[in-house]
A protein has these predicted regions:
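Short Cys/His-rich zinc-binding micro-motifs
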Residues: 51-61
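E2/UBC-UEV (E2-variant) core
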Residues: 162-214, 251-253, 257-310, 617-618, ...
Length: 697
């Protein structure tokens, strides 16, 4: 089953595979696809919920004759299934129960209020909810997303999944264990008053009664489930809130900016929305008249602990990466702006020559592409351009006032995407983004003051409330959207195919516990490889719980400088050792600077140490199972600042201009802090650390 799911086999492919097996090894596997699915099929059920074909009002899940309470249209479940007037609902409770019983360390964290914010649990809103007493020690909370995904190029059909993550899981575990409670399929966007209803109804029950589950000691727990955060883009967000879209009057989800056109700066500053006012506006609104941008009540208002203002976040994938960053690039390079002083399209060929030579580490999956191809760039590519490439590349190309303006934006994002964000730094970023948005109008004109530029003024509030931007971004949800698109073949029964395959994946680990218990190591290794998307970890051996090395090391002698560096660290003289050019420390893959396979398009050896030094990794030296170290060559920091804003008293501390040095050092693996991007631009070398070790493309 793991092979079938990993390689996304069609029913025909599976049938052929079963036939081949049965010809060579009769009776070892089921004979038909029906028997195969019966033996290894999905765990859990799903059911269709119907809506009126005329007005899309919710009709429920009962079979037989159905009558709409609004328009009195009469239909039945069979005809609704044929016409596609339904959506699929999966039990969120059973998915979370399975997750809780698998991840039993879920409640071991003790999040305390401190000077830094390192995840959602450190945010003010989460802490406030925890301190209210509504949330017990065994209770959990959710961050969820709803967005549309087009299925076919030749039609308008799309799916709208609701995805949920458990906040109390570690960030990587959180993103790897997404729950899918509802799936909409159709030619147009879902009618949210209908689509959200089963989701809200189940959440209301889970908030009140909780989920019963047993730990490894067979002790029963009851965990209530609270819906705290919705992270969706600016198109889906007003549908969920039942408000006007951003291009309408009072279309901002967080303040009372008039909108309806360019989001220019207003005096006085528009007042922030509140929960009480939103409820009043929703109740006062009618079909003919909206109130301050609110069209009416949303089903989400039935959830006792979900906030209609602070519960939504201005997530940065669409606002920052696909929003303001893309907008700036189009302003700079679009030929329609050739008469503007910010236009640099005539220099795009020169910039491309440098841009395509940049060699990011493996965490940045996509290598830089030509500026001419920017309409094909993904959100992760725009993120890389903003964080790592733009400032060094455009230095001396953009007029200084535009380049200094860009620095404010880059500075802010480096801090807000940090693994740990200092609360005092958020205040600095808030001033930086305020200046950025005010200058944006002066530099690029009022006509270019888009909603995304306006949304930047609300991002710092989101970080205070719910943690760093990476913690509430839609990147993981969008990635899972791509996974769902692989779960169907052909054009018939698409939602059913997607849901069945999703449930098969969910049940795979449960069934594997029994089936794989007595399997030999070779079979377990194959199974692990089929489950993992990180194939590099399958061919490695463990030195200790934090360090893994890859096969085929080099045996050799240390040079005199290398031997001296090792003696300085370990206190012993060593002449021979084993050299590893690929290794993993705390889940992060490193290469040596001489690793041949990666050197063409990647520089995966530039690191920052815990003491602040910048280095290139030469090799991992292993003397015994318990004695090893990393050999590095230091990069000399020139101390020159790339950029500075004297008014705000901020500098580009996240960019270091460096020179090569001959200083070789040996350091313990625990001293490796984070990977860096090494940029060569304008005949200078710059090192820019990755803001955090959690996000991956």
């Amino acid at each position: 089953m793991s092979f079938v799911l990993r390689h996304n086999l069609t029913a025909v492919s599976l049938d052929h595979l079963l036939r081949i097996f049965n010809e060579h090894f009769p009776g070892m596997v089921p004979v038909t696809t029906y028997l195969f699915r019966k033996a290894y099929g999905q765990y859990g059920n799903y059911e269709p919920h119907f809506y009126c074909p005329t007005c899309e009002n919710y009709l429920g899940k009962s079979t037989g004759e159905l009558q709409c309470d609004i328009c009195h249209t009469v239909t039945d479940s069979d005809s609704s299934l044929k016409s596609g007037c339904f959506f699929l609902v999966l039990s969120l409770a059973s998915q979370i129960q399975t997750l809780l019983e698998e991840k039993q360390t879920i409640f071991q964290k003790d999040w305390l209020i401190s000077d830094t914010i390192s995840d959602i649990q450190c945010g003010e809103e989460y802490q406030k909810f925890k301190e209210s007493g509504a949330m017990g020690e065994d209770d959990i909370s959710l961050i969820w997303n709803c967005d549309g995904i087009p299925l076919f190029r030749s039609s308008k059909y799309q799916i709208w999944p609701i995805q949920c993550q458990v906040i109390e899981l570690e960030p990587r575990e959180r993103k790897a264990n997404i729950c899918l409670p509802c799936l909409w399929f159709g030619e147009k966007k879902p009618y949210m008053l209908t689509f959200l209803r089963p989701f809200v109804d189940e959440l209301s029950i889970l908030q009140k009664d909780g989920i019963k589950w047993k730990d490894s000691a067979n002790i029963e727990h009851t965990s209530k489930v609270f819906d705290l955060i919705c992270s969706s883009d600016s198109v889906a967000r007003p549908l969920l809130r039942n408000t006007k879209q951003f291009n309408g009057f009072y279309g901002c989800d967080f303040c009372y900016h008039v909108g309806g056109g360019p989001y220019t700066s207003k005096a006085p500053v528009p007042k922030l929305r509140t929960e009480v006012e939103h409820f009043d506006h929703a109740l006062a609104a009618t079909l003919e008249k909206t109130v301050m941008g609110v069209k009416g009540p949303s089903p989400l208002m039935k959830l006792e602990n979900f906030q209609m203002i602070n519960g939504f976040v201005p997530e940065y994938q669409h606002c920052v990466c696909l929003g303001v960053t893309m907008q700036l690039a189009n302003l700079w390079f679009d030929s329609r702006n050739h008469e503007q002083e910010w236009y640099i399209g005539t220099k795009s060929d020169l910039l491309d020559k440098e841009l395509v030579t940049f060699k990011p580490p493996v965490e940045i999956i996509r290598v830089p592409r030509s500026v001419a191809d920017r309409k094909y760039w993904k959100a992760s590519e725009w993120r890389s351009v903003l964080l790592f490439y733009a400032l060094p590349l455009l230095n001396g190309v953009l007029l200084r006032k535009f380049w200094n303006h860009l620095f404010l934006f880059v500075f802010a994002m480096h801090i807000l995407l940090g693994e740990k964000v200092k609360r005092c730094d958020i205040d600095v970023v808030e001033r930086s983004l305020r200046k950025f948005t005010l200058q944006f109008e002066k530099l690029y004109g009022a006509a270019n003051m888009t909603f995304n530029v306006r949304l930047l003024t609300h991002i710092t509030t989101s970080v205070r409330n719910w943690g760093p931007l990476w913690a509430t971004s839609t990147f993981s949800f969008e990635s899972f959207n791509g996974t769902l698109l692989k779960y169907y073949h052909g054009t018939t029964h698409v939602p059913e195919q997607i849901v069945r395959r999703f449930l098969c994946w969910r049940s795979l680990m449960q069934k594997a516990e029994k089936v794989m218990a007595d399997a030999n190591d070779g079979v377990k290794k194959i199974f692990s490889g089929l489950l993992s998307s990180h194939l590099h970890s399958c061919n490695s051996a463990s030195l200790n719980e934090n360090v893994r090395v890859f096969v085929k090391p080099c045996h050799g002698k240390l040079s005199l400088p290398q031997s001296s560096a090792v003696k300085k660290l370990l206190g012993v003289t060593v002449s021979q050792c084993v050299f590893y050019h690929r290794f993993i420390v705390k889940g992060i893959l490193y290469h040596s600077s001489s690793y041949r396979k990666a050197v063409k398009k990647r520089i995966n050896s530039t690191v920052e140490l815990l003491d602040g030094r910048l280095c290139r990794i030469l090799s991992l030296l292993v003397f015994s199972q318990s004695m090893h170290c990393v050999l590095v060559r230091e990069l000399k920091n020139t101390g020159k600042l790339l950029c500075r804003d004297s008014e705000l008293n901020i500098t580009s501390t996240f960019v270091s201009e460096v020179l090569q040095s001959n200083n070789v050092c040996a350091v313990p693996t625990d001293l490796l802090y984070r990977k860096c991007v090494l940029i060569e631009a304008r005949a200078k070398n710059y090192v820019i650390p990755l803001p955090n070790n959690i996000e991956r493309d």
